[in-house]
Amino acid sequence: MTTVIDGKDVAASVIETVKTATSTLERETGVRAGLAVVIVGDDPASHTYVSAKSRMAKECGFLSVQHTLPEETSQEELAALVAQLNADAAIHGILVQLPLPKHLRSEPIIQSILPEKDVDGLHVVNAGKLATGDLEGGLVSCTPAGAMVFVRRTYGDDLSGLSAVVIGRSNLFGKPMGALLLAANATVTTAHSRTKNLPEVCRNADILVAAVGRPEMVKADWVKPGAMVIDVGINRVPAPERGEGKTKLVGDVAFKECAELASVITPVPGGVGPMTIAMLMANTIIAAHRKAGRRPPKF
């Protein structure tokens, strides 16, 4: 019987851990976790995301600060705000919502956030710590961190003897996911658009992770019977069966056929997606614990 992971359920349990850790930290040390979210311009999708993040931060008991800047904000003005938040002792996590308006360069802004406050896990120092296996000192990008919660809850902390294949080599997901699996002692293959015999490579995987942005690319004959399949793709495709001009969300995995072979599989939507905001909250409470000299909770 295949287990279909309910990402909302797992995310809710992560949030419960965050809430408990937040109240304990404040009670025992007087430190209240603080998250600052910065948004520039009026992109509706970005505003929806930011509202959800700010709402969740409040629900967790954090000090939740939102800075909404006008579209015409200059590079210097945005950099000055980040510098101000870096210096603010009440703020443990800083998130600059991407994408920024076209006239702004996001990379210098992201790299100007103090690594210990970089709760998105995008700073090169955090990427470097992960690449060198330092999971205790850095902050991990939220989506791969969330996918790893699924892996740990399925296989435990030690993946010795298990083969993992990650399709996709992006800095945002593929590379950090591979590094996390490797740190847990899996034997990891990073596959991508130039990989030869991709279905054959995937058939060796006990843990198969797809993150390439190609709708339903992974078919049943790519899946080893009994494997765990994690689908990180979010693709909007036409859905004529729902009416003219209608669309639906699908992942990078042909869910129905692969679910017949996999032992554990994540759906799209409702799988990895809900974990992203949950792990942002987890990173914030981890950062607050470190700042207070306390051992952070495990997720």
UniProtKB/Swiss-Prot annotation:
CDD domains: NAD_bind_m-THF_DH_Cyclohyd
Pfam families: THF_DHG_CYH, THF_DHG_CYH_C
GO biological process: L-histidine biosynthetic process; methionine biosynthetic process; purine nucleotide biosynthetic process; tetrahydrofolate interconversion
Keyword Phosphoprotein applies: no
Record's protein name: Bifunctional protein FolD 1
Reactions mediated catalytically: (6R)-5,10-methylene-5,6,7,8-tetrahydrofolate + NADP(+) = (6R)-5,10-methenyltetrahydrofolate + NADPH; (6R)-5,10-methenyltetrahydrofolate + H2O = (6R)-10-formyltetrahydrofolate + H(+)
InterPro entries: Aminoacid_DH-like_N_sf, NAD(P)-bd_dom_sf, THF_DH/CycHdrlase, THF_DH/CycHdrlase_cat_dom, THF_DH/CycHdrlase_CS, THF_DH/CycHdrlase_NAD-bd_dom
Keywords: Amino-acid biosynthesis, Histidine biosynthesis, Hydrolase, Methionine biosynthesis, Multifunctional enzyme, NADP, One-carbon metabolism, Oxidoreductase, Purine biosynthesis
HAMAP family registered for this protein in UniProt: THF_DHG_CYH
Pathway(s) per entry: One-carbon metabolism; tetrahydrofolate interconversion
GO cellular component term of the entry, any: cytosol
UniProt keyword NADP, yes or no: yes
Record function comment: Catalyzes the oxidation of 5,10-methylenetetrahydrofolate to 5,10-methenyltetrahydrofolate and then the hydrolysis of 5,10-methenyltetrahydrofolate to 10-formyltetrahydrofolate.
GO molecular function ontology, one term from the record: methylenetetrahydrofolate dehydrogenase (NADP+) activity
Assembly mode: Homodimer.
UniProt superkingdom: Bacteria
Binding-site residues, NADP(+): 168-170, 193, 234
Enzyme Commission (EC) number: 1.5.1.5, 3.5.4.9
Family, per entry: Belongs to the tetrahydrofolate dehydrogenase/cyclohydrolase family.
